Amino acid sequence: MASKCLKASFSSGSLKVPGGAGGGSARVSTIFSSSSCKLSGLSRGPRSFSACSVGLGKSSCRAASCLPALCLPSGGFATSYGMAGGWFGEGILTGNEKETMQFLNDRLASYLEKVRQLERENAELESRIRDWCEQQVPYLCPDYQSYFQTIEELQKKILCTKSENARLVVQIDNAKLAADDFRTKYETEVTMRQLVESDMNGLRRILDDLTLCKADLEAQVESLKEELLCLKKNHEEEVNSLRCQLGDRLNVEVDAAPPVDLNRVLNEMRCQYETLVENNRREAEDWFNTQTEELNQQVVSSSEQLQSYQAEIIELRRTVNALEIELQAQHSMRDALESTLAETEARYSSQLAQMQGLIGNVESQLAEIRCDLERQNQEYQVLLDVRARLECEISTYRGLLDSEDCKLPCNPCAPDHSPSKSCLPCLPAASCGPGTAHTTCSPRPICVSCPGSRF
């Protein structure tokens, strides 16, 4: 319908009109398209035109049942036109050119009339279509905005539910992790409690061992006290016996009045032994006092340690829930206690070794004292023998002095012989004994001391 006006150019004024086989009346039918118009089925009188083609430049026109209004101009042809046609049947032009042109003009007029009619019908159809479209209620799309709002709300709820589910899943995972942590903490606490209980049992056993050691040491102290008392008693008895013996001997020797000052010697010996005994006694008392003080201090320290252990046990019972935090502190405390126990055992062993060494020293001193006492007893026996021999000699000399009435000169070898002086007889050293016979000796030229005498 939007095609341009056609310009018919007929070459050299010739027209070829195809005719039908029957040669009936002419009928024009137009067919329009975007760029062509074709005439078909033209027939007039005894001849029929089956097709008529009009060359319009580059476009062609075929007559059909309809032809658009703009395909041809409203007026006639202003320019020359050419038509070509073929006769069917006889194919021979009859009449002259004027009739042919008239025929063609009539045909063209009818054709144009038909075109105008079709244009009017087309316009009428267009107006009817336009009226129908105006009368027809326009189709409205349904309003889905409320549904969209509902869908958006539901989507928001779904997103919130998904986020809530994710949060719940995260919380569940966190709760599971926390439960696992608490389970591991509980297991560690249980194991730590078992370890602490085992440590407490070990400390109780150590405390029992220390109590037994304390009882043993107290028993040893008591036995050492008793032994010390026995030693003191024996020492006092021996000292008293020695004093009695030395006192008796002193009384006897005072009467003898020897040239050697035995009293001074005995006094010196007595002073030495008394000082030695006093020093030994003082040392023994000091040692005993120091050992007693040390044992008391050890008892006090053991009681303090026992109290500290009890306090630690109470503190451990209170701090069972915080064992994981104080684990290292408890380990260090245990190490400190073990080191203290080792130091205590080492100290006790060293003190025991010292006590054994002191006991060995005291025993060696006692052995030396016994040896000294035996030596003194031997010397005392020797002195008693000497005393007996001296008393025997004195009694012998007295008997001889009393029995003899002969008067011997004191110096018979001198030129002046005086009968008033006499010489004492000489006795051999071997004859001075309690069981020997008393014999006299011949007078000597010079009165000198006997070779075996002590005076």
Swiss-Prot record:
All residue ranges annotated as the IF rod domain in the record: 97-408
Segments for region (Linker 1): 133-143
Region annotated Coil 1A, chain positions: 98-132
A Pfam family this chain is assigned to: Filament
Gene behind the chain: KRT35
Gene Ontology CC: intermediate filament
Miscellaneous note of the record: There are two types of hair/microfibrillar keratin, I (acidic) and II (neutral to basic).
GO biological process: epithelial cell differentiation; intermediate filament organization
Similarity-based family: Belongs to the intermediate filament family.
Region ranges (Coil 2): 261-404
Site location (Stutter): A346
InterPro entries: IF_conserved, IF_rod_dom, Keratin_I
Keyword terms of this UniProt record: Coiled coil, Intermediate filament, Keratin
Protein name: Keratin, type I cuticular Ha5
Region (Tail): 405-455
Region of interest: Linker 12: 245-260
